[in-house]
């Protein structure tokens, strides 16, 4: 078991107005808290592992693209969503938001 205290969390601004706090990182899983400023943006990207997100505060628009379709969803406080591995996705933040994200690091 590994305990990570708040003072030891790795904190980085991953995009303008988007702060990531690594809450825990194991061999096969990563969990982080994201803090988004109003009107910030996470550009389109993809990764080889699933992502699970729960919104603690605020509202965001999520655009998820597969090879043959594009889905746009709005997520609000209390909502969760899953991005399958290798799906392109981006986030458009309409108001200050906080999420908890987890990734399974083994495809």
Regions found by a protein language model. Give the residues of each.
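Short acidic-glycine-tyrosine-enriched beta hairpin
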Residues: 67-85
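Histidine-centered metal-chelating micro-motifs
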Residues: 41-42, 61, 81-90
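Conserved short histidine dyad/triad with adjacent acidic residue
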Residues: 30-47
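Ligand-binding loop in jelly-roll beta-barrel domains
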Residues: 85-107
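Glycine- and acidic-residue-biased ligand/ion/polar-headgroup-sensing regions
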Residues: 49-65
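A cytosolic small-molecule/anion-sensing beta-strand core signal
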Residues: 56-57, 76, 95
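A short, N-terminal "cap"/entry segment at the start of jelly-roll beta-barrel domains
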Residues: 1-28
């Amino acid at each position: 078991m590994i305990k990570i205290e708040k003072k030891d969390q790795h904190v980085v601004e991953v995009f303008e107005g988007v702060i990531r706090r690594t809450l825990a990182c194991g061999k096969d899983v990563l969990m982080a808290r994201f803090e988004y400023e109003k009107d910030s943006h996470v550009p389109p990207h993809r990764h080889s592992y699933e992502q699970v997100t729960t919104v603690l505060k605020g509202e965001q628009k999520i655009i998820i693209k597969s090879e043959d379709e594009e889905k746009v969803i709005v997520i609000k406080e209390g909502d969760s969503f899953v991005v399958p591995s290798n799906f392109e996705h981006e986030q458009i933040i309409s108001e200050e938001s906080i999420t908890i994200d987890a990734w399974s690091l083994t495809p």
